[in-house]
Amino acid sequence: MDPKNLTVEQLAAELTKLQMENSHLKRKLRRSVGGPPKEPPKPRELTEPERQLVLARWHNRFSSRSSELLRRQLDKLTATLVTEEDIDEVLKNADFRLHFRPDPSENPEKKLSKEKRRTARGQQQ
């Protein structure tokens, strides 16, 4: 069928037929994949021991990172000092402020989204 020779009514009928076929194929695909898309489950509330474990894990991340930053600052402050008295004098009067964020490479959600983007990019090519 050449679309140039069809009337508007015939084109509308053809469009309707194709849309119905498309929706039928979508339903068929959904059934073969396991039904309509489901909402992700809501996160459940943590019990107190589970909450403490999650907080302890974050505390370990922060404390290891902060101790590394503190060691670097101490090395900078005491790089030129050679006697124990000089080091004690400088560190006694020092004011430390450590600013940092958790390492984004440790965030599994971001890793997952990057992997999804890579696979999507691979499928497009």
UniProtKB/Swiss-Prot annotation:
Coiled coil: 5-33
Pfam family, one: Herpes_BLRF2
Biased composition (Basic and acidic residues): 39-50, 96-112
Protein name: Uncharacterized gene 52 protein
Biased composition (Basic residues): 113-125
Family: Belongs to the herpesviridae BLRF2 family.
Region described as Disordered: 22-50, 96-125
InterPro entries, per the entry: Herpes_BLRF2
Source organism: Alcelaphine herpesvirus 1 (strain C500) (AlHV-1)
Keywords for the protein's UniProt record, in alphabetical order: Coiled coil
